[in-house]
Design a protein with these regions (language model features):
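Glycine-centered loop/turn motif at secondary-structure junctions
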Residues: 1, 52-53, 136-140
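Vicinal oxygen chelate
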Residues: 20-22, 27-36, 58-59, 68-73, ...
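Hydrophobic small-molecule pocket/channel-lining residues, especially in calycin-type beta-barrels
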Residues: 77
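N-terminal amphipathic/basic-hydrophobic helices that include classical n-h-c signal peptides
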Residues: 1-25
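Hydrophobic ligand-binding cavity/cleft-lining segments
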Residues: 27, 39-49
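Short, conserved charged micro-motifs
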Residues: 43-44, 119-127
């Protein structure tokens, strides 16, 4: 069985039956940022920018480019992080931070790239495969197709340029 927790921009979270939440004590989430541990933050950010149509955040005040900003940092801090964001401000910001270790196990969290929403059967699989073909030259790796079952439509499991799993859904 595979179940995904999906954040849909038009419907909010979908997980099980609703429970009572006291709105007086509930925190109000203003934004969501997804953070990736990686060895090359800029390369992973460039990959996800191409996948999602995201852009770099605004250049910090006082600098004419991100490269100029990076050059102003201490040597040990250069290249330690990068980010990208939805140009429309709707999707979550993605943040990439350098860590010394490489990925060794399956992700506990992954992104679903919703390219087949509303499609079923062969039409859905064709859309997933077409997107996988587009992402291959960017450094993505196709792992396997999870066929449709009684609970879920088909999805395609992929890896980004550093081996982080994601699904074409």
């Amino acid at each position: 069985m595979r179940n995904h927790l999906n954040l849909h921009l038009d419907r909010g979270f979908q997980v099980g039956p609703p429970s009572h939440i006291d709105s007086d004590t509930m925190a109000t989430v203003k934004q969501v940022q997804v953070t990736f541990d990686c060895t090359n933050p800029r390369a992973v950010a460039e990959f996800w920018k191409a996948v999602l149509g995201y852009v770099d955040p605004p250049i910090p005040p006082g600098f004419d480019s991100w490269d100029a900003y990076e050059a102003s940092l201490p040597v040990e801090s250069r290249g330690s992080s990068w980010a990208c964001q939805d140009p429309d401000g709707i999707g979550p910001r993605l943040y990439f931070q350098r860590v010394p270790e490489v990925k060794t196990v399956k992700n506990r969290l992954h992104l679903d790239v919703r390219v087949g929403a509303g499609l079923t059967g062969d039409e859905r699989v064709s859309a997933l495969e077409a997107e996988a073909a587009r992402l291959g030259p960017l450094g993505a790796r196709r792992l396997h197709l999870l066929p449709a079952d009684e609970e879920n439509e088909a999805c395609l499991v992929m890896q980004d340029v550093e081996g982080n799993e994601f699904c074409l859904d």
